[in-house]
């Protein structure tokens, strides 16, 4: 089915207000969920909203909590999220990293005791739109086996790197081949994954999203490389924030909350003039996109460039929502 942005935001707002969330908080949160969905990231927008409400109802998320700065060391700050709403807090933290970068050239905010930030790419994009390089990542509850294991002991720990090119170039990637949200998107659409995304119950690689969702044997991106990167990202976020590691979140909490996150902004214009920056970025993009195609019918992709078209399509033709997901939201 198709809905307008206003209908989608209104549905989110209704549910949030029914939980006695303050009007301004409900409006900003509903706006972020709707913008994420409108941008084509359904897995962490509309599809994720019922799970967000479940955690809100369970008390994992404290909607009126106010993040507090704990430590300030010039370009580096440490904050405690106080388990406030994840996407609103993450937006504020990237804004703060940008403020620090405007003073120091680089700004880093390390956040502890946070909630799921929904679409991590929103915060990298937020920095790049203002002309900054944006880098951020989060740890999570253990939802992926480390390379060589069957049990989930590491997080998918998504990493975002956004570059202020025209259009914005951005990598927004889980340390698994697919996030659990993308497994759900493909299952709901009745599709196999385009490449292997995990292991079946017999330990064989599989493209069946439902099998992987059930047995939780998701495949690390790049096999042992994604596993290793997940581990070091967790270590850095834990140390810089003085917050909880994947192990602590998994063993000490009843669900995924109290995670640790990093937000970095770099003001490129302090290092290079705008015309030179644009020329260098354009040369990189042209060099890549003019390569001989492996398939004449498949364009060479630059990361993040597809979001401009997705956003335009959804604004022109309406936002496609899975019927079953919409029914869940209407029932909340």
Curated annotation (Swiss-Prot):
Gene symbol of the encoding locus: dlgD
Subunit (UniProt): Homodimer.
Record-linked Gene3D superfamilies: 1.10.1530.10, Hypothetical oxidoreductase yiak, domain 2, Hypothetical oxidoreductase yiak, domain 3
Protein name: 2,3-diketo-L-gulonate reductase
GO cellular component, one term: cytoplasm
UniProtKB keywords: Cytoplasm, NAD, Oxidoreductase
UniProt family annotation: Belongs to the LDH2/MDH2 oxidoreductase family. DlgD subfamily.
Keyword Heme attached: no
Single Gene Ontology MF annotation: 3-dehydro-L-gulonate 2-dehydrogenase activity
Disulfide bonds: none
